[in-house]
Amino acid sequence: PTYTPELCDAMAELAAGADILTPNLTEAAIILGEPIGDDWCGTDISDAEAARMIDALVAKGAKHVVLKGIQREGESVIRNFVGGVDCDMFEAANEYLPYMLHGTGDLYCSCLMAAVMAGRSLHDAVVFAGDFTHDAMIVSAKQPDFKNRGVSFEPLLGKVAELLG
């Protein structure tokens, strides 16, 4: 199995020292030792629940948390909530696209860190990462057999280079 209790404990230890922790809801639940599986609430959580999870992750030692992938029933956006030490919680949302692609979480985190390292604020970095990932998913959907190929971001790399300009 991929997720062993030992791996989950090690993830929680690493998370405690994070400057910017970027879990999806499943990862956040695992780090917090909260139920997943049949008892898990899924991705349709309230603002208050997002704030509770962020506060709990900060209490474990993360400086900032970007809680990714909140998708509420009947809405056409996907939300990411951000909060942390000396950072009031805020939300950044993008259009929800009705398909999943491998690598979007890694791409999002890479873009977030690129923007932070280029001197952007956490707010601007979160917006950049969400927009870049969204746009890469649209580019990917134009390719044959795209759902089996993973996210194609290469045509958009100029946007990352522009962070330095």
Annotated model-derived regions:
Residues 99-122:
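Short, small-residue alpha-helix embedded
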Residues 27, 69-73, 95-98, 130-134:
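Glycine-rich beta-alpha junction loops
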Residues 2-89:
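Conserved phosphate/ATP/ADP-binding segment of small-molecule kinases
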Residues 32, 116-117, 137:
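Hydrophobic residues in alpha-helical segments
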Residues 89-103:
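Short pre-catalytic strand/loop immediately N-terminal to key active-site residues, enriched for Gly-Thr
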